[in-house]
Structures are given as C-alpha cells and as structure tokens.
Design a protein with these regions (language model features):
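Active-site lumenal/periplasmic loops and adjacent helix-entry segments of GT-C-fold
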Residues: 11-156, 189-193, 396-399, 420-426, ...
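Transmembrane alpha-helix segments characteristic
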Residues: 15-18, 216, 220, 224, ...
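Membrane-interface helix-loop-helix junctions at transmembrane boundaries of multi-pass membrane enzymes
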Residues: 4-8, 206-217, 265-297, 336-353, ...
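Transmembrane catalytic cores of multi-pass membrane glycosyltransferases
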Residues: 38, 175, 184-282, 312, ...
Length: 543
C-alpha cells in the first residue's frame, strides 16, 4: 500500500470531521420532525421581530408576562432573516438555524486548534473529536441553540483571532476580534462571559505584554460599539435592572462535580474522548504545559451552568494530544526492541520538554504508520456509531405530534385570556418541551413555564424553578388534592395533562411513565370536566 503522508491524512480527517459532524448536528431534528427540546420562547421572539418590523421590541409576547426583550437578539434576527428569506415559519427557523451554526462551529474550531497546536495533524484530530463529542453538539442543536450555536461559533472565531493578535500583533486582527466578539455578546449571555474570561486567560498564558494588553482594550471598545444597539435600547426601555437580574441567575456550584468525575462529554457508551483527554492532561502536565488543562477547568468556576460547552473546546485538543503523543507513540515504540525502556525514555522526554511552538518534536516521520491508521479507523467507526446513537436518543426530547395537535385545539377553542396548569411529570424544567412550547403554540398563559422568567425573577429565579417541582410531582399521586395544596384553583382555568412521559432530562425513558391514578381522581372530581382527550393528552376545564 502506498504510504500516506500526515498532511494528506490530516486533510482527510478534517473533511470527515466537517461533513460527518454536520450530519450529526442536523440528524436529531431530522429524526424528530420538530425542534429538539426547547426554543418555544425564541420562536415567539422571532415573530415579535416580524410584528415590530425588525425594531427591537420592548417586551416579548411569550406567556403574557411582559418579559423584557432583554436577551441578546442576534439569534432572533438570524431566525427572522431565515424565515423571511426561505418563506418558513419561526418554528421551522428555530428547528434549522441552530444546526446550521453548530455545523459552522466545526471549521471555526479547526482554526482555533490550528492557532494553538501549530500543527494541522493535531488540529484535524482535535476537530474530529470536537465534531463527534456529544456535549459539543447537544445543547447547540436544540431549539434554544438559536442563540447558543451562533454564540459558540463567534466565540471560537474571536479566540482564534485573539491568539493571532497576541502572537503576531496584526493590527487588522483588532477589528476582526472586536467584530466577532461583539457578535458573540449579541448572541448569548453565557457566550459573552466565556469569551471574555477565555480572552483574559489566553492573554495571560500567551503574551502578558503591554502591547497585547492595549490591543485587547481596543478590541473591547469595538465589542462595546458592535453590541451597543442592543444594550443601549434595553437600558432605554428598562434601565439596567434586566441585566442585573439576568446576571443573578447564572452559576451552578454542583457543576464542578461534572469536572471531578469527568462525565461532561456525555458519551453514551465508552467515554473514549474523555479518557484520551485525561491522558492528554497528564501528558501536558508532565511537559509543564498548563494552558489547555487550566483552560478546561476555568469554565466550571466561572459559569458552572454552561461550563461543559466551553470546556469541550480544550478537551478535544487534549484528547488529540493524548492519542498522538501518548497512545500512538507508545504503540509505535512497543513495535521495536526494548519497548518498555523506550516508553520510559519517551515519558522522561515528555516531562522535560518545554517547547510550545509546535508539536513536531514528537513526530518521528512524515509518513503515517499502519498502527496509527488502523487504530484511527476503529476510533472513527466507534465515534460515528456512538454519536449517532446519542443523536437518536436526543431526537426523543421533542414535542410529539399529539401534543402539537392538542395545543392547536387550545388555540382555536379556548379564550385568549385563559390560564393553564400544564402537567407533564418531568423533573427538569430545562428539558420539558411541552411546558416551553405550550405558550408559543397556543398563545395562552402557562403558570409554571419558567423560560424567560430569569429576566423578571433575578436572584429568586432558582427558588421559582424549585417551586414548580411539587406541582409536577402531583402526577404521581392518586389524589388530586395534592394539586390543590400545590396551587390554588383560582390561579388557572384549565389543566393540561400529558398522559405519557416519553423522556426525562432530555433522554428517552426505557419504560415510559403513565399516570392512571391521577387521571382517575381528576375524572372523579366534580370540579373538573374533560373538554379534550386523545390517547396522549387530556385537558380538563374547571366547572
């Protein structure tokens, strides 16, 4: 067989990463036939822009709560443009735009990896791990990815440009980093936080020069200028209060345990990428190369709720280093004589090495070895299967057709001012498609839908979320008096019940849950009357 050069292999890997990764990002919504999980509020906000002729509205119509339209609006404008350009509904825009920008993030990641690792072979393998790491795609391809995926895309471009600015001092990069950074800020609040913190960290690790610091200040001024139309309008309408309340809802202290147990890759079977990442961490620490390990840890202490997404970026690079510099190098060494001694020498060489300008020091040949080729082919096939299976499971976290039909009935047959108590039995408000999509598809108010309330509740947001759990737990009760203890009947006009719980925490249940005893008690209650019923949904109206 003709020898394969590493450059040719790297080009092939990159091409596979981009195309297979894009397929994996579009596949869940293709399988579901609807947006994955969330995005109901965002669909309404896309329609709000249509009603306001693209001017930033003061409030969103979602759930009739006068929620300030304070969310970074770039994703909504992208959704509105896609809807108008292709003649699709806001719901369809929320379905497709996230997967599109999540796919664009793959080549953007390659650019960042190439700037950091200084070698296209390592960068290409890193990109493949990023493309096929479940956590690098899951929350970005959901309906809520309308803002998350552009935020991820522009964050990657910002950091890649900043690295070149710090290392090469190109003046044009000040403009481009400011532009991309401004678009990241305009996309998602957590993307703004992680971009800002990562930029400071990279400056500290790569430069620490006065010139780079001044350039960073110039980038920051451009970011403020680019994002000014949004935050100036919000301050004009509402003052700074929505921003203060939004900032008070972040954090998740327990997220650090995801780092401790190294489970945040969300791989459904063998955690291959996580294990290779751990090997890469050990190797980098032995070389006293702390940039990637520290960068992976920082998000969990800055913004724990969303830490896994940005942590996946350095982890993918660490996994590539672990695979090439440790696994491949050890296997190649074992083929020769005195394998154990050579491995020991290799480890010692790694420990004392301090060269950071590139990774060519550990490559013995420009030719790809048969071991590398065979192991890589196996890893590729396994990761494709694993990621496809994850996407298949993720496709179950969607709004099922019976719920869509029931919500259409609600829109057409109930008063516009009607208030609904929506019961699904889920234990995660962030993975409850019915609760979030109900106000969007019906135009009616849902009492315990939490989306958007972070801009109203502020520091009380987490307490408000916890207050929704007792209501959902009533579905497991055989006595509907549980409901009366959780919420007064005067607060709602109808009770919407999903009879079957298909998935929980965004993953399908092995055994679907039903709630026959609760439904029987509701039917027996003279205060309620079933006004709509199908095999999957029942709606009770108060007598």
């Amino acid at each position: 067989m003709k020898p394969i050069r590493r450059k040719e292999w790297a080009d092939l890997i990159l091409m596979l990463a981009i195309f297979i990764g894009a397929f994996m990002r579009f596949n869940p919504t293709l399988l579901a036939g609807f947006a994955i999980n969330d995005g109901g509020m965002f669909a309404v906000m896309v329609d709000d822009l249509n009603a306001s002729n693209y001017f930033l509205p003061k409030f969103t119509a979602y759930n009739h709560l006068n929620i300030p339209f304070a969310y970074p609006p770039l994703g909504f404008y992208l959704g509105r443009i896609a809807a108008d350009l292709f003649g699709i509904s806001a719901v369809q825009a929320v379905r497709w735009v996230p997967a599109f920008f999540a796919s664009l993030s793959i080549p953007a990641f390659y650019l960042l990896a190439l700037r950091l690792l200084k070698d296209n072979y390592y960068a290409a393998i890193s990109t493949l791990f990023f493309a096929l790491m479940p956590r690098a795609l899951s929350w970005f391809v959901m309906g809520g990815g309308l803002t998350r995926s552009p935020g991820q895309f522009f964050m990657l471009l910002t950091l890649a440009t900043l690295i070149r600015l710090y290392e090469e001092n190109r003046r044009t990069d000040i403009f481009w980093a400011g532009l991309f950074g401004g678009l990241a800020v305009m996309s998602h609040p957590e993307a703004a936080v992680h971009t800002f913190v990562s930029a400071i960290f990279l400056w500290f690790m790569l430069s620490r020069s006065r010139t780079a610091f001044i350039n960073s200040l110039a980038v920051g001024m451009i970011v403020l200028l680019i994002s000014a139309p949004w935050w100036v309008a919000v301050i004009h309408y509402h003052g700074v209060e929505p921003f203060l309340k939004g900032l008070a809802t972040g954090q998740k202290v327990l997220a650090v345990f995801h780092l401790l147990f190294f489970v945040f890759t969300e791989e459904p079977y063998a955690t291959v990428i996580a294990i290779l990442g751990l090997i890469g961490i050990a190797y980098c620490l032995a070389r006293r190369d702390y940039l990637l390990p520290l960068w992976m840890v920082i998000p969990f202490f800055v913004e724990g709720r969303s830490a896994a997404g940005p942590a996946a970026i350095p982890l993918a690079m660490l996994a590539a280093i672990g695979l090439v510099d440790v696994v491949f190098a050890a296997l190649s060494t074992l083929r020769g004589r005195g394998g154990a001694a050579k491995i020991e020498a290799l480890v010692e060489k790694a420990r004392v090495a301090t060269e950071k300008a590139g990774r060519s020091d550990v490559q013995q040949s420009d030719q790809l070895s048969s071991i590398e080729r065979n192991v890589f082919i196996y890893l590729l096939l396994y990761l494709i299967f694993s990621t496809y299976q994850f996407g298949f499971q993720l496709s179950n976290a969607t709004l099922y057709p019976p719920d869509q039909e029931a919500m259409n009935w609600v829109r057409e047959n109930t008063p516009a001012e009607a208030r609904f108590l929506v019961l699904t039995g889920t234990t995660s408000v962030s993975c409850d498609s019915v609760l979030e999509w109900f106000p969007a598809l019906t135009g009616r108010q849902s009492l315990y839908t939490v989306q958007g309330t972070e801009w109203i509740e502020g520091a009380n947001f987490n307490s408000y979320v916890k207050s929704t759990y007792p209501v959902q737990e009533c579905l497991s009760s055989a006595d509907n008096s549980c409901l009366d203890m959780a919420v007064s009947r005067s607060q709602y006009d109808y009770v919407y019940v999903s009879k079957i719980l298909h998935s929980n925490n965004c993953m399908p249940l092995d055994i679907q849950r039903t709630f026959p005893y609760f439904l029987e008690s509701m039917r027996a209650d003279s205060g309620f009357d079933a006004v709509y019923e199908s095999d999957d949904v029942i709606i009770f109206g108060k007598q």
